[in-house]
Amino acid sequence: MQLAIVLVAAGASTRMGFDKVWADLDGEPLLARAVASARSLQPAELILVVSAERLADAARLAPEATIVSGGPRRRDSVAAGLAASRAAWLAIHDGARALAPPELFQRGLDAAQPTGAAVPGIPLKDTIKRVAASRVVGTPVRAEHVAVQTPQVFRRDLLLRALAMTDDDVTDEAILVERLGIEVAVFVGDERAFKITTPLDFALAGAVLSDSRHVR
């Protein structure tokens, strides 16, 4: 079964104030840890989507990978990664979710088989409110919702159709696949797959790595 893992790492990192996926985390770039996790799922193809100025850095980091330049929007970067592969299945993964365990990729591929699409989800810890004009207008039932992570796994033809259907930019590819009327399966995510988008997240990632060394 052909699988390509597309690591999306071309974002502007505006919340961090610096290019987070290339920042040092315990002695190596954050992106290197995402690459190491993806490498463990063999014989999957690895595609790195990075900003134009980081193409050479990415080639040194993962010489076995296909390196492509991303676009100004997330959907543009995903489309660039998709165009670089002919694999039947694509796992779209945020480079900033660098501590996602390798087993998430296989879990996602297995979960996607019935419908062609699957996303990892974890239970919400906080109460969620719908807000308009700084006023609460509703409270969804927390048990009916999950926080969605990556890797998100799709059959190639579905993802191609979803991207071709609209030029809208979205926060994840599952939104576009849902608009096709396709049922998206949800599999069990992992708290370690959190997205590192703030300095506090970066500090937490360092603590997770330190704790994992002590456990071993």
Residue locations for each model-derived region?
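Residue-level signal for inorganic ion chemistry
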Residues: 7, 31, 81, 93-94, ...
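Structural beta-sheet core signal
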Residues: 5-7, 48, 92, 117-120
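Short beta-strand-to-loop acidic/aromatic patch adjacent to the donor-nucleotide binding site
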Residues: 87-97
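Short active-site oxyanion
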Residues: 42-47, 116-117, 192-193
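SAM-dependent methyltransferases
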Residues: 1-4, 172-174, 191, 199-216
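Conserved N-terminal catalytic core of the sugar/cofactor nucleotidyltransferase
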Residues: 31-88, 166
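Conserved core of the sugar-phosphate nucleotidyltransferase
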Residues: 58, 99-187, 216
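N-terminal glycine-rich phosphate-binding loop and ensuing alpha1 helix
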Residues: 1-53
